[in-house]
Amino acid sequence: MSVVENQDGWWGEGDDMFFVDGERLPSINGTGSEDYFLGAWDFGGKPFAYGLFGAPIVGAELEGGRWSVYRFHLDSPIPFTKALRATIEHGHANDRGDNFYSVAYWYQTEPHAAFPVLPASEMRLPRVFPAARAQK
């Protein structure tokens, strides 16, 4: 996941939540983004990278700060049958307006039913509101 901060301060207090197979309440409710990415206490203020988790880009806690973090669940899978929804709050109590970007990988066994048609690409692309300092 990558983050571009649109305001000063720490972006990483948003809780991670995993909703399995249509749950109304999450089966997994974490304690903060930095904990989910296994880098508590602001990732130690410096980049790090391991096989299953890391923070290769650690920016300043300022408007325009850029961060990139990752975690692979090879050693801690989250099983589901029909659906898995993963969310991360944008700051504690969803009180931040930063830009978050993410990607998820899933390994499909064969055979499988046909997948639904994806919306047009212009409908799937995020609307980006760049931070003022990031443009300087």
PLM feature spans:
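Beta-strand-centric surfaces of beta-sandwich/beta-rich domains
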Residues: 1-136
